Structure formats: C-alpha cells, structure tokens
Amino acid sequence: MKAWNLDVQNATARVQLPEGLVVQDYYMSQGYYDLETGTWEIGDIPAYEERSLTFICLLNRTGSVTVNANVTADGDDNSANNNAELTFKVFGISDLEVNVTGNKETARIGDTVRITVKLKNRGPHDANNIKIGNFLSGGLVVQNFSYDAGYFDDITREWIFETLAAGEEATLTLDCLVNRTGELSDYVSVREVDEGDVNVYNNMAHASVAVKGTDLDLDLSVSKLRAYQGDVVNVVCRVRNNGPETAQNARVNLQLPGNLQVQHVQLDRGTYSNGVWVIGDLADNETALLNITARVMSAGNFTLNATAVSPAIDDSNPVNNDDTARISVAIPKKTLKVRIKNNSAVTIRVLLYVTVNDHGKITRKTYNFYLKKGLSRDLSLGYFQLGTTALFKQYTYNTNYRSRTVSYENTYNATSVITQRVNVSGVKGRQKAPVVRIATLLLDENGTSLQ
C-alpha cells in the first residue's frame, strides 16, 4: 500500500483470502488486521510512503488461486488503482514411476526386440502435462508401437500425457529392429511434469539387449623362434570367425620387418599386398590361412604384429584380434679348418700365425710343427660367424742340408672348400730361407673366398 504525492487518512484495506490458503502467520508494518473479517485498519499514510501486510499461508488444494484486495482512504483523489488481484496456480504432488523391460536379453542382427515401458502415478495427486523421453540406441529402429494412454511421437520419441490420474498406470510398447551389434538400450526418463515429484529416484529406467557381432580370432606364429641369418622361415597367420555374424570385408594388417625378405605367399582366400591381407567375407566358424615364406636377411631380435578387423560390423570380443610373434636371429657360426699336406720330397717345418677377426673379436693362434713327406696335418681353428676374416701368415722351411723344392698344399674348409698349392724350387736347407705365404680368408654365406 503506497500513498503518492498526497497524505491520506483513515486508510482501510480489505484482503480476501480464498479457500485453499490457510493462514499460518501474518504481520504488517502499521495498523491492525482482523483475520476473521479480512479488514486491515491502516490509519494515516504520509505522501510517498508505503505500508505492507504479509501473509504466510499453507496451500491445501490444487488449481488456480486468486487473492483480491482493495483500499479506501480519506484524501485519496484517484480510486482507479485502489483494487488489486493476484492469481497463481497451485500444483499438486505426484510420484511418477517408470519401468522398462525387454523381451530378450540377447539378440542377433535382424531380430525384433519388444520393449515395454510402464508409467505409473503413485499420487497423491493427478499429474499433468507429462513428457516421457525415450533415448534409444542407434541400433534399435522402431518398427511398430502401441500405447493405452497418452500419445507417442515417433519422431521425437516422446510419450506425452495431458493428465495421468493418481493410481493410474499406462503402457507403451515399442517393437524395434536390431541393426547393429553391441549393448543396445532404451533409456527412459520423466522429462516434464507440472506437479512436484516426491521421489525422483524412480523417474528413470532402462532395458538393454546384448547383440553379438563377429568374433575374429587371430593366431600368428613363425616356424622358427630362433634362426640364423640366411635361414628361410614361414610366417603363418590364421584367422577364425567365432561368429555368430559373418565378418564382412575382413582384413589383417601384417607388416613384416625389414629383415624378412618375402620369397613366396600362399593363402586360401583373398589377397596379400603391402602388408595387408584382404580376406573378404568370413562366415561363422570359417577359418582363413596365410603362409608367408621369407628369408632372414640380418641378425637381431624382431617382433611381428598382426591385427584382424571387420570394418563393416562390430567385433564383440576385440581381445583376440591381435597377436604377436617374435623371432631371434643370430649370425651362423661355421667351423674353420685347415689341412696342410706336404707334397715335398723332404720333411718340412711349418710355422703358421693365424689372426681371426670375428666382427671385432680378435683370436690369435700359432702352430709350429714338422711334417714328413706325403703326410698331412689337420688344424681346427674354432667356430666363427659369417663375415669373419682370417689372416694366415705361413713360414715353410726346408729341413734338409741341401737346397730342395718345397711343395705343400693348404685346404681351407669353412662355408666352402678352397685349396691353395705352393711349389717353390731351390729353397735353401737348414731353415735358412723359408717360403713365406700370406693369405686372407673370408667366411661368407655365399662361400669362402681367399685373397
């Protein structure tokens, strides 16, 4: 209540509280209020000042509520604004309960799943302007629907009610086509309702169906876990579809390391190129096999990785889509042997110095012996890797008192056999002038060479 530019006297207001508003308390800034008659005796109000009356009320019914008030005062020259009205709507209390069930726990692509949604108003009041949202997984396509109350919008997936009476229950049925694998669900929730809900914990529910797709099971192996440089190995990749659906456009990514040189590819279906094995469709319980024959070109520890995928359909068990095979490659070792045969007519003395370089590891050996005519001596120098070089420095002496012809034959046996013959005439006797021969031997996978 406000006086504008003039003082007013003996102001009296009447406030009419309708049924549904039960006064619990009230207070005013001036005057006296009679609760029985609804009359507020205010008294005088100076210009530009306000006086107020406040009610604290209990709402005990739903619907539209209107409060009317009017005021009279001496000195009030404008009665046009002496009346006021306040209207508001009182909503009730409801307890909407949602339940969702499906007729299948598991399904396959192409199956129809029936989802049943039940909405119950547990009261105590009617619920108005209800919207129930259905959040369907992308793999569930609504084909048919029916309901016994309200209205279902198949575009927005909303189930709409003007009113659901206290104690009333409604049912919505959705028949959905399954067109995707995975865990598919319908999440249902109360999106809108005019009334306050005393229990929001039962406003949401969901039902799920597990749709299995393919299950590609990949196994990768090598014929030799330990191999030598130059060996030939088989890389075998097996893919099985454990189902239940057909794996469409199945493929395997199998990139071979650089130390494996492909010699031959054998497969029972599809093509293998640039590290990709395109299998195509692989039906339930079918198996595809790939066998790659490759030569090991260098030493080291190498890992092969393979991954199977079916891009057109989900794999319900991706754990077994990958596999790994490891191969440890060493440089092979060969025995280095030398046979020295005396083809001279006299006994000779051989003094042999050997220096072996096995990839930086140096081995030195010295041999000093006499060899009668026509006899041989076998020397075993040890085991060495391919790529080893051996330097032979050989001194051969004439043990006779007179000059003689020194003739001997060296046979080197490693990755291949090489024979070296030496024939020197007029060699002074009694170890005065030995025959000196220096040679370098190379052990290679293609054979032994002498320089």
Swiss-Prot record:
Name of the protein this chain belongs to: Uncharacterized protein ORF5B
Organism of derivation: Methanothermobacter thermautotrophicus (Methanobacterium thermoformicicum)
Family of this protein: To ORF5 in pFZ1.
Top-level taxonomic group: Archaea
InterPro entries xrefs: Chlamydia_OmcB, DUF11_rpt, Ig-like_fold, OmcB-like_DUF11
Keywords from the UniProt entry: Plasmid
Pfam families tied to this protein: DUF11
